Amino acid sequence: MKLLLTTAIATVSLIGYGRPAQESGSNPEPQIQAQKIQRVEEGKDEEPEISIHRAAWEGDPKVVEQCLINGKDVNAKDDLYGDTPLLWAAGFGNKEVVEMLITKGADVNAKAEEGWTPLHYATGGNDRGIAELLIDNGADLNAKNAGDQIAPLHWAAWRGHKEVAGLLIAKGAVVNAKNKNGGTPLHNATWKGHMEIVELLIANGADPNAKDAEGETPLNWVEEGKHKEIVDLLRKHGGKTGKELKAEGE
């Protein structure tokens, strides 16, 4: 389990989306916006501060649109993480830009270098509105990143995002999806002590005895995390430790 936890913690540090309010969805003042649009029209949009990715990050649909009018690729990848404008917009909670990019043909399943999708980013930011918009336009509910094989539901369970987790499940996400090390969303929710997520997952068919690569179940994880109320809930639904299952020949 230690390897799996290290991986999960690294993932938390990597994604880091769900920015403070002052950093997301904040349109520039009209004068600044007009200057940016003019520079884009003049073909000076190679500068980072007025690039299509920066405009998507800032939540500036007019500048994004002007970049596209000037021939910028709606699915262009940046040099930092291989993110497309849609990944930036989804990650920073800029729904208006997300909507516009989708109408302009943005790939809703575009992947960054590490395999994260716009839906992963929206889930990480606990943005139900953007998550639903992406799903309704074809986003893969069960897409996994390249290295750790983490699906959006793993991420929602880890971070305790109940509304987004509920949306993913309602739309058909696999509740017993396993990551690279065999961990399920229920493993994540139990370790972090997210009682409401645990209840939600179990109510929708999560296996309380799913084993990770080390043969440990959610009950093993929660007992290390010291969340007694979750231990009781898992036991109520037939949850056992890996050792108990092994003794029973399972």
Q: Which sequence ranges carry the predicted segments?
A:
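Ankyrin repeat (ANK) core detector
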Residues: I50-H53, T84-L87, T117-H120, I150-H154, ...
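Leucine-rich solenoid repeat scaffolds
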Residues: P208-E250
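Ankyrin repeat structural motif
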Residues: D60-L68, N94-I102, D127-I135, H161-I169, ...
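Intrinsically disordered, low-complexity regulatory segments in ankyrin-centric signaling systems
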Residues: L4, G16-N70, E99, T103, ...
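Ankyrin repeat boundary/linker residues
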Residues: D45, D78-D79, A112, N145-A146, ...
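Ankyrin repeat A-helix N-terminal signature
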Residues: R54-D60, W88-N94, Y121-D127, W155-H161, ...
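Sec-dependent signal peptide recognition
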Residues: K2-A8
